[in-house]
Amino acid sequence: MGSVLFIRHHLEDNPGLIGDAFIARGFTYELVMMDESAPTPSLDGYDVLVILGSKESVYDHEVEAAWFGRELALMGEAAQKGLPILGICFGAQALCRFHGGRVELSDAPEVGWYEVEAHNGSKIVSGPWFEFHYDRCVLPAQAQLWASSPGAVQAFCVGKNVGVQFHPEVDEDQLRDWFEADLDEHPRDFASRDELLAQTARETPAARERALELVDVFLAHIVD
């Protein structure tokens, strides 16, 4: 059906369940890095752009100077080509910023599995979805809210572009990779690593189905 370009910002980030869902729907994908040392990728030959998460913040001026400015420009190129974007966590915040919204430090960060509430007739399922974020989006006027939690916007669209604050790609392997990459970092006031891994192992079979449903919602939206 087409080809998807996934952009990651850390080597331990992978398409995971979302990559599997696109494959199940007949797509192929490629995964490239976007950071200060990586060249800006070409969009030629792709039908969908997916921007994964990052530990960084879109409002960090040093990050923008190092590589995020190029990512914003790439999003502009995608818009010119009519290439729909799916933004995940940092990717959703990048979309929010690109479309004129604001991203700010959240007073209610979320780490773990959370339910979300759908809005405006969206078909985003309640979850639970895996969350790992400390920032939140303040949407631009032209955005349509698709889902929220008490602490954050959880899903939205602007035209054919869709952002989700949660991590639909996460399974137990992905979460373990994140933890192994940051052995000295763990958020305070949340469940322990072992507890999060155990819950993620329990949730992964259902999360796989939810990821497929999310890709179906996205694909239906971009061809509507």
Give residue ranges: language-model regions.
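Flexible gly/pro-rich beta->alpha loop and the following alpha-helix that scaffold active-site loops
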Residues: 23-86
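Short N-terminal binding/cap micro-motifs at the start of the first secondary-structure element
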Residues: 12-17
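Extreme N-terminal starter segment of soluble prokaryotic enzymes
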Residues: 1-5
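Catalytic nucleophile loop
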Residues: 77-102
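Cofactor-binding loop segments of dinucleotide-utilizing enzymes, especially the Rossmann-like FAD-
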Residues: 7-9, 34, 90
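Amide-donor transfer/coupling interface in amidating biosynthetic enzymes
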Residues: 6, 104, 118-224
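Short, electropositive alpha-helical surface patch
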Residues: 103-110
